[in-house]
Swiss-Prot record:
Gene3D superfamilies in alphabetical order: P-loop containing nucleotide triphosphate hydrolases (3.40.50.300)
Residues the record lists as binding ATP: 24-31, 122-129
EC numbers on record: 3.6.1.15
Annotated TM spans: none
Designated name of the protein: Nucleoside-triphosphatase THEP1
Keyword Nucleotide-binding: yes
SUPFAM superfamilies listed in its UniProt record: P-loop containing nucleoside triphosphate hydrolases (SSF52540)
Record's catalysed reaction(s): a ribonucleoside 5'-triphosphate + H2O = a ribonucleoside 5'-diphosphate + phosphate + H(+)
Natural source organism: Aeropyrum pernix (strain ATCC 700893 / DSM 11879 / JCM 9820 / NBRC 100138 / K1)
Length: 206
């Protein structure tokens, strides 16, 4: 997709008050884009809610993923490869080499989503993937957000269409953007413009 087409798609999406959903291969810059967009929205006075799931590295090796509440900073582990990182107790689910800490993850997710519903202008979810969907309650909460019409920006797993066709159909109500090395630069350069359009549409104090 050419830069002009990408710009028109994204700004048209925002102005029509549709949700924005970003996907692509690992390392394509999805989370970087959403993080920079969140920073730009905060500068414009938007109240943000939701969560991000950053990776945790030790000695250059990925050992875990966390769940971090965007608004409060509350955090917990989503999944760990090294079980010594996990507190004892709580429900767990195996996903490849990772152990999903169901109860710990849901504690942070549920607080973040509930507070976002009540207080945020824009909800951000990074990401929607197999490990997040292994947490009971998350899919239902996400569906509620999608049905609410509240402004939403997500990152989702590139195979979600196969993993959960029903959820993918809900995302298709909004705008889906495929991010890869060809359009990463143009998309990052559009962050400020997208943030301005989003804040004008969604943020009452902007």
């Amino acid at each position: 997709m050419q830069s002009r087409e990408l710009r028109e798609q994204l700004l048209g999406c925002v102005k029509s008050r549709k949700s924005l959903h970003v996907t692509g291969p690992p390392g394509s810059g999805k989370s970087t884009f959403v993080s920079r967009l969140a920073e730009a929205l905060r500068v414009k006075g938007c109240r943000l809610g939701g969560f991000m799931a950053p990776e945790v590295r030790r000695g250059g090796r990925r050992v875990a993923f966390k769940i971090v509440d965007i608004a409060s900073g509350e955090e917990g582990y989503l999944a760990v490869a090294d079980e010594s990182l996990a507190a004892p107790g709580g429900r767990r689910a195996r996903h490849g080499r990772y152990l999903v800490l169901v109860d710990e993850a849901w504690r942070v997710m549920s607080h973040a989503i509930r507070n976002a519903f009540e207080h945020a202008d824009i909800i951000i979810v990074d990401e929607i993937g197999p490990m997040e969907l292994a947490v009971p309650g998350f899919r239902e909460a996400l569906t509620e957000i999608l049905d609410s019409g509240k402004p939403l920006v997500t990152v989702f797993h590139r195979r979600l269409r196969t993993l959960d066709p029903g959820l993918y159909k809900l995302l298709e109500r909004g705008c889906i953007v495929w991010l890869d090395e060809r359009n990463r630069g143009p998309l990052i350069r559009l962050v400020s413009e997208i943030a301005s359009a989003l804040s004008n549409e969604a943020c009452g104090n902007s």
